[in-house]
């Protein structure tokens, strides 16, 4: 809940800026000005960098005499109160305007974040540059030695942070109401319900998290470029990348790079610059769909019992954001040749732990012995296919995963994949196409419309066709929707 609140906060106040959301409340105390942070770039363009806080400050690793305390500039940042609600019935407000929805049943998830008045603390950069002149970093420091051994890691220094001024509360309220006699309702979080044979079931769940004063909710860093002799410079200009001199950049993967080649999307745009093409963004998505069919082929080739079991776990993940948030870093660790930590598993409930272990076993990973991860080439390919889908799901907007899960229950995922392939250059598909027949149903189309809207695609049903329009500044969400739909479709594909 804390991670969701901080992400929503930055989405509102610093959407295109350099601030980074704090995802774990326990990390707040570690975020001191001039603390050293490592930034690890990940494999696919949509994955956000991974930051790790070191138990050192910049002054701790300099060879010269004691480093002076930084000059800190403090200012009021903003008084922030955000309220976010997802409605299954009624009107959905999007950047496209109002999208009318007409669904059976109703569901509302409301998350309210009230951080109140926030304080910004930042280092005086000009003074920091003057204080750092002619100084060198001790690259023999044991902690930095471990950083140097890492793959694609960049050393950064924390130069600004946003903190709360008073105690605040983050609350999440969930109400689920399902029409059991017809359409499948939408659940955006796992809630235990007792359904009657043909009636309405309502269950409320309230969760409150208290945040103490002086809690850091966001921070900013500057990358360092470190030379072989320990001299360093601050990367102040956008586009200037940090790193270590003569350290060869390699794929941030532990497995055979050939396994990744099909997934690299070399021709796809970087996530930061949006989807663009001379033929238009819809054309890019259609090209991606053709490539994705090949990428997810290992799913379609699985024996039916294994495919069904893996599909069931993915559907459980779609309705369980806590499990999804743990599953991605576990896959990250396995890619790097690391075993999942006991602490990570301890964050999960017993049923979630069972699903996680079952997932890893189904994709060929062993948690026993000295070498974690898949062993043979076939298992590596299967694991990477699963990791590919997990990483895309993890970066989807809030509620999109649950909407995908609802579409799985309605068995319309193949219909949506076909819709993307069948779109004309101007974004129109004929509803007389037999495969698109489910979209004639008003309730089903409303759910699909909301799913596409969450991925910055406006979907409008005309008299005998469907028209799709991608937002001008949509960035990577349409591509992520394309990836997740194709992955789930491959898992549900019938064996020939």
UniProtKB/Swiss-Prot annotation:
Q: Name one GO cellular component term.
A: membrane
**Describe its PTM?**
Cleavage at Asp-270 by CASP3 (mature and uncleaved precursor forms) or granzyme B (GZMB) relieves autoinhibition and is sufficient to initiate pyroptosis.
* Effect on the protein of changing residue 270 to A/E: Abolishes cleavage by CASP3 or granzyme B. Abolishes pyroptosis induction
Marked site (Cleavage) residue numbers:
270-271
Tissues with expression: Expressed in cochlea. Low level of expression in heart, brain, placenta, lung, liver, skeletal muscle, kidney and pancreas, with highest expression in placenta.
Keywords for this entry? Cell membrane, Cytoplasm, Deafness, Isopeptide bond, Lipoprotein, Membrane, Necrosis, Non-syndromic deafness, Palmitate, Transmembrane, Transmembrane beta strand, Tumor suppressor, Ubl conjugation
Region Membrane targeting domain, as annotated, extends over 1-56
Please give the Pfam families that the UniProt record associates with this protein. Answer: Gasdermin, Gasdermin_C
Domain of life of the native organism: Eukaryota
Result of altering residue 267 to A: Abolishes cleavage by CASP3. Abolishes pyroptosis induction
The impact of changing residue 217 to N is: In a lung cancer adenocarcinoma sample; somatic mutation; reduced ability to induce pyroptosis
Domain notes from UniProt: Intramolecular interactions between N- and C-terminal domains may be important for autoinhibition in the absence of activation signal. The intrinsic pyroptosis-inducing activity is carried by the N-terminal domain, that is released upon cleavage by CASP3 or granzyme B (GZMB).
This one is known as: Gasdermin-E
Q: Can you name the source organism? A: Homo sapiens (Human)
């Amino acid at each position: 809940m804390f991670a969701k609140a901080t992400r929503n906060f930055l989405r509102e106040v610093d959407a295109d800026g350099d601030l980074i959301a704090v995802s774990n409340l326990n990390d707040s105390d570690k975020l001191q000005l001039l603390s050293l942070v490592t930034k690890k770039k990940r494999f696919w363009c949509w994955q956000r960098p991974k930051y790790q806080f070191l138990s050192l400050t910049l002054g701790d690793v300099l060879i010269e005499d004691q480093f002076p305390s930084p000059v800190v500039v403090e200012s009021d940042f903003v008084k922030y109160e955000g309220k976010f609600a997802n409605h299954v019935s009624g009107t959905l407000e999007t950047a496209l305007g109002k999208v009318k929805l007409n669904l059976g049943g109703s569901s509302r998830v409301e998350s309210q974040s009230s951080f109140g008045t926030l304080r910004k603390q930042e280092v005086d950069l000009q003074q920091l540059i003057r204080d750092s002149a002619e100084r060198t970093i001790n690259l023999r420091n044991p902690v930095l030695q471990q950083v140097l051994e890492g793959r694609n890691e960049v050393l950064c220094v924390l130069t600004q942070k946003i903190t709360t001024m008073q105690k605040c509360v983050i609350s999440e309220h969930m109400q689920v109401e399902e029409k059991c006699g017809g359409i499948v309702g939408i659940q955006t979080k796992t809630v235990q319900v007792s359904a009657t044979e043909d009636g309405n079931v309502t269950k409320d769940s309230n969760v409150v998290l208290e945040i103490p004063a002086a809690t850091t909710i966001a921070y900013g860093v500057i990358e360092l470029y470190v030379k072989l002799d320990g001299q360093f410079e601050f990367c102040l200009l956008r586009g200037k990348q940090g790193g270590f001199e003569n350290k060869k950049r390699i794929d941030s993967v532990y497995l055979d790079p050939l396994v990744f080649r099909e997934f690299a999307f070399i021709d796809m745009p970087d996530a930061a610059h949006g989807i663009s093409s001379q033929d238009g963004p819809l054309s890019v998505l259609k090209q991606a769909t053709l490539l994705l069919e090949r990428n997810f082929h290992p799913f379609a080739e699985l024996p039916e019992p294994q495919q069904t079991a893996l599909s069931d776990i993915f559907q459980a993940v779609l309705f369980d954001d806590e499990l999804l948030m743990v599953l991605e870093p576990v896959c990250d660790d396995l890619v790097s040749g690391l075993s999942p930590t006991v602490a990570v598993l301890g964050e999960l409930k017993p049923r979630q732990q069972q699903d996680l272990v079952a997932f890893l076993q189904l994709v060929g990973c062993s948690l026993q012995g000295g070498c974690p991860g898949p062993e043979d080439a076939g298992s590596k390919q299967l694991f990477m296919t699963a990791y590919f889908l997990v990483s895309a799901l993890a970066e989807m907007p809030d509620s999109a995963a649950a909407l995908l899960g609802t579409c799985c229950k309605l068995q319309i995922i193949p219909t949506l994949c076909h819709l993307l392939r069948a779109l004309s250059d101007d974004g129109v598909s004929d509803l007389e196409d037999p495969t698109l027949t489910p979209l004639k149903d008003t309730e089903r189309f409303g759910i699909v419309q909301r799913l596409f809207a969450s991925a910055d695609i406006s979907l409008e049903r005309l008299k005998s066709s469907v028209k799709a329009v991608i937002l001008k500044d949509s960035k990577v969400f349409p591509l992520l929707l394309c990836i997740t739909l194709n992955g789930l479709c491959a898992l549900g594909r019938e064996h020939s």
